[in-house]
């Protein structure tokens, strides 16, 4: 396993190597040593000329790959420039399924962070457990869901909550460059932590 994330929390907490899943050793399934999945799933699509194609369609709006890339790049700048994100830091994402949730996820990955998405129904107690176990210090949160997260913050090491949905996060994004150089993660670096309820 290569090491590129400066905050090694995720690698340090993996199960023993003998419990890792078995992977195929077919050459066509090999990944390069350095791979940021945001480049593969977003940047490469735009570079190949598909930037104006829709990536997310909601009842209110249709979002293109180019728009998602721009917003993700600006979010990555907010994380690095304003929040002091260190590659490997976990970032809690609290929102319903939405365009902005996807943009935040890609922004976290571009910056070398690890996205920890939550369900909107989680209360302060469940959020607090996640924040503690994953040692989360930064959160992006839909302003409509802020109350439970703010309650969870009181007894945690969560330092920063940036709200979106007509709030401060969009203001911070608006002054950031539209380009971002993705953090050069290794192909085996963790990019998400998914807590489950056991269902």
Regions found by a protein language model. Give the residues of each.
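Flexible, non-catalytic linker and terminal segments flanking ANL/adenylate-forming cores
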Residues: 1-36
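AMP-dependent adenylate-forming
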Residues: 39-67
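Adenylate-forming
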Residues: 42, 68, 72, 91, ...
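Phosphate-coordination loops involved in phosphoryl transfer and adenosine-cofactor binding
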Residues: 53, 87-89, 187
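Conserved AMP-binding/adenylate-forming
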Residues: 61-63, 78-122
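Conserved AMP-binding A3 loop
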Residues: 64-67, 191-199
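Conserved ATP-dependent adenylate/AMP-binding module captured primarily in the ANL superfamily
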Residues: 89, 122-152, 175
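Conserved pre-ATP/AMP-binding loop-to-beta segment of ANL
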Residues: 176-195
């Amino acid at each position: 396993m290569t090491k590129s994330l400066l905050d090694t929390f995720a690698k340090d907490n993996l199960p023993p190597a003998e419990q890792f899943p078995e992977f195929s050793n077919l050459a066509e399934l090999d990944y390069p040593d350095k791979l940021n999945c945001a480049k593969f799933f977003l940047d490469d699509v735009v570079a190949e000329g598909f930037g104006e194609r829709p990536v997310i369609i909601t009842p209110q709006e249709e979002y293109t790959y180019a728009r998602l890339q721009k917003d993700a790049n600006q979010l990555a700048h907010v994380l690095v420039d304003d929040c002091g994100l260190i590659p490997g830091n976990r970032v809690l994402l609290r929102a319903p399924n939405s365009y902005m949730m996807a943009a935040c996820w890609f922004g976290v990955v571009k910056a070398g962070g690890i996205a920890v998405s939550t369900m909107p129904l989680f209360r302060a107690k469940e959020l607090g457990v996640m924040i503690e176990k994953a040692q989360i210090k930064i959160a992006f949160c839909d302003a409509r869901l802020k109350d439970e997260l703010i309650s969870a913050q009181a007894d945690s090491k969560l330092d920063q909550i940036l709200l979106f949905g007509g709030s401060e996060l969009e203001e911070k994004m608006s002054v950031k460059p539209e380009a971002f150089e993705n953090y050069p993660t290794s192909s085996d670096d963790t990019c998400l932590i998914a807590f489950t309820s056991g269902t």
